[in-house]
């Protein structure tokens, strides 16, 4: 895809399959996927490490895409909930959970701000929230809803240090503090983060 919102398969399947962190993933257009599989496994391993799961937690994963982080965390959590705005990605996430025999995952399609607000008003109190937003970072209302849910930990996967810094500052206003950070070079040999 270069530009546009219509996709046409010219040859072969209209999706890709990949194995990541021991799980099989289906990826349809226009879903996001980390192109550097080896470093993605390092990144997701760090997310799992920072989440510090024991098997009894509920995890909310905002901006879950096709469920890569959500399903990687599902192996170590009691319940995982993924949210994503791209309908084909959510369809793939649900399929990926079934494909990998993961039964403790559920997925919602919609804007992260709307879903976070709805889950918070419904009384969801996750132990851990993971976020992996696009370069623009988190909207203030997403941060407010996450903070209102009161998770013990927020694991923030960022591709833009500037928006990460901005969002950490806002989280601080809600009583959170940054405790750990790790850099993963997703694009070795380039200036990209």
Language-model segments: residues:
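Rossmann-like S-adenosyl-L-methionine
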Residues: 1-193
């Amino acid at each position: 895809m270069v530009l546009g919102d219509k996709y046409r398969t010219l040859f072969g399947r209209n999706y890709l399959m990949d194995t990541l962190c021991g799980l099989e993933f289906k990826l349809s257009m226009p879903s996001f996927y980390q192109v550097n599989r080896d470093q993605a496994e390092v990144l997701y391993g760090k997310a799992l490490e920072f989440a510090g799961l024991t098997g009894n937690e509920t995890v909310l994963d905002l901006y879950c895409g096709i469920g890569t982080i959500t399903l990687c965390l599902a192996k170590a959590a009691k319940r995982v909930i993924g949210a994503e705005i791209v309908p084909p990605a959510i369809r793939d996430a649900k399929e990926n959970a079934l494909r990998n025999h993961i039964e403790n995952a559920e997925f919602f399609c919609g804007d992260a701000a709307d879903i976070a607000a709805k889950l918070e008003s419904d009384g969801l109190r996750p132990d851990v929230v993971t976020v992996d937003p696009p370069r623009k970072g988190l909207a203030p209302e997403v941060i407010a809803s996450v903070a209102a849910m009161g998770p013990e930990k927020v694991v923030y996967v960022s591709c833009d240090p500037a928006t990460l810094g901005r969002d950490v500052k806002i989280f601080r206003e809600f009583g959170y503090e940054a405790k750990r950070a790790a850099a993963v070079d997703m694009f070795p040999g380039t200036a990209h983060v």
